[in-house]
């Protein structure tokens, strides 16, 4: 593989010295970009775009043509695993992801097939290797997966949910069945992320989007436990360097110390946690990623710049910070405002790395 020209992101995740704070955005390849919307129209729909290797590669690279980002993230969806397990993923306009089949019983869990990521999700592996080739060492490529708990919520609810009543019904009423499902999913995620690493991903992130809807004990038992299992099962060295792992639980700031103990190299923070306070709590155990409120991108550019300056100041000097939003960028953001955010990180962060 080509030598990496910009390894700032990987170095920061390992808390090694960098010249400035690296920056990327969750959902950086997305609907806020007119060029993304044009490519998606070519593909027909979101799922076809994920499964079309040249087009998935094209949209992954689009934000890098526009902005001085320090990482690319595979263009895909967290729900590829349940789709490969036969649940029949589809998207309804304005309603988000849906499944034709749902998991509600012990029999449903027992009927789930064992997944082989390299054959069942070969389109993802092809996308990873193609993107890696096209990047030609420009920046590292991030692979990713949903967490077992987050995947389970979609599989049980049949889509997204405000209350998660069906998922919680299974969790509280038949915890042993829920544990079997989560264990099955953890094995699938290990296989999936290791497949991405073998195909060329240089770092991986586990998205625990819905971990924050759980009570503290339930988070430890039904979400963090399985992410810890995944981290334990991942390939941690490839092409002669460490493959860092980032764990991101939305609304998980209260469990930061526990998450920092799961074996990951970095913890993603949403915007509800103060990053200076988070750094004081974890010390130099893990790097931190985040954590500007994505809605700040609606503000005037000068205000965005001020917020970036404030977050940099709160984190303080030294490595171990990857700047990002606290969640994905929203579709109605002006690309120029995203540019102002990235530019501010590039221009203002050097002073913290003297």
From Swiss-Prot:
- In this UniProt entry, which residues are annotated as the site Transition state stabilizer? 77
List the keywords (alphabetical).
Cytoplasm, Decarboxylase, Lyase, Porphyrin biosynthesis
EC annotation from Swiss-Prot or TrEMBL: 4.1.1.37
Whether Secreted counts among this entry's keywords is no
**Cellular component GO terms, alphabetically?**
cytosol
Q: Where in the cell is it found?
A: Cytoplasm
State where substrate binds.
27-31, 77, 154, 209, 327
Task: From the UniProt record, list the reaction(s) this protein catalyses.
Answer: uroporphyrinogen III + 4 H(+) = coproporphyrinogen III + 4 CO2
Q: What class of enzyme is it?
A: lyase
- An example of a Pfam family matching this protein is URO-D
Q: Please give the Gene3D superfamilies that the UniProt record associates with this protein.
A: 3.20.20.210
**Which pathway does the protein contribute to?**
Porphyrin-containing compound metabolism; protoporphyrin-IX biosynthesis; coproporphyrinogen-III from 5-aminolevulinate: step 4/4
The signal sequence is none
Example of a GO MF term:
uroporphyrinogen decarboxylase activity
Q: Which GO terms describe its biological process?
A: protoporphyrinogen IX biosynthetic process from glutamate
Q: Which InterPro entries match?
A: UROD/MetE-like_sf (IPR038071), Uroporphyrinogen_deCO2ase_HemE (IPR006361), Uroporphyrinogen_deCOase (IPR000257)
Tell me if Cytoplasm is a UniProt keyword of this record: yes
| Annotated function | Catalyzes the decarboxylation of four acetate groups of uroporphyrinogen-III to yield coproporphyrinogen-III.
Q: Which family does the entry's similarity section mention?
A: Belongs to the uroporphyrinogen decarboxylase family.
Q: How does it assemble?
A: Homodimer.
The molecule here is called Uroporphyrinogen decarboxylase
Species annotation: Marinobacter nauticus (strain ATCC 700491 / DSM 11845 / VT8)
Q: Which gene encodes it?
A: hemE
């Amino acid at each position: 593989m080509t030598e990496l020209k910009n390894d700032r992101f990987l170095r920061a995740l390992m808390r090694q010295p960098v010249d400035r704070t690296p920056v990327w955005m969750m959902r950086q390849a997305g609907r806020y970009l007119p060029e993304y919307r044009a490519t998606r129209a070519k593909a027909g729909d979101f799922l076809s775009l994920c499964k079309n290797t040249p087009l998935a590669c094209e949209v992954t690279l689009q934000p890098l043509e526009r902005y001085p980002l320090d990482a690319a993230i595979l263009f895909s969806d967290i729900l590829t695993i349940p789709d490969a397990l036969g649940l029949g993923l589809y998207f309804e306009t304005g309603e988000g992801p849906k499944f034709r089949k749902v998991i509600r019983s012990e029999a449903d869990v027992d009927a789930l097939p064992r997944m082989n990521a390299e054959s069942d999700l070969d389109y993802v592996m092809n996308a990873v290797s193609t993107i890696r080739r096209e990047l030609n060492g420009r920046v590292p490529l991030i692979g990713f997966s949903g967490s077992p708990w987050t995947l389970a919520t979609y599989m049980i609810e049949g889509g997204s949910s405000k209350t998660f009543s069906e998922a919680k019904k299974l969790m509280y009423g038949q915890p042993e069945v829920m544990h079997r499902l989560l264990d099955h999913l953890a094995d699938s995620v290990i296989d999936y992320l290791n497949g991405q690493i073998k195909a060329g991903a240089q770092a991986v992130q586990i998205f625990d989007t819905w971990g924050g809807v759980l009570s503290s004990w339930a988070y430890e038992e039904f979400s963090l436990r399985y992410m810890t299992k995944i981290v334990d099962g991942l390939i941690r060295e490839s092409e002669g360097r460490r493959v860092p792992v980032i764990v991101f639980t939305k609304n998980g700031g209260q469990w930061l110390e526990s998450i920092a103990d799961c074996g990951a190299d970095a913890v993603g923070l949403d915007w509800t946690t103060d990053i200076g306070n988070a750094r004081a709590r974890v010390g130099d155990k893990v790097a931190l990623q985040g954590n500007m409120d994505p809605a700040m991108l609606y503000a005037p550019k000068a205000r965005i710049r001020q917020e970036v300056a404030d977050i940099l100041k709160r984190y303080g000097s030294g490595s171990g910070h990857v700047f990002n939003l606290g969640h994905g960028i929203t579709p109605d953001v002006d690309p120029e405002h995203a540019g102002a955010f990235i530019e501010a990180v590039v221009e203002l962060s050097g002073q913290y790395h003297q």
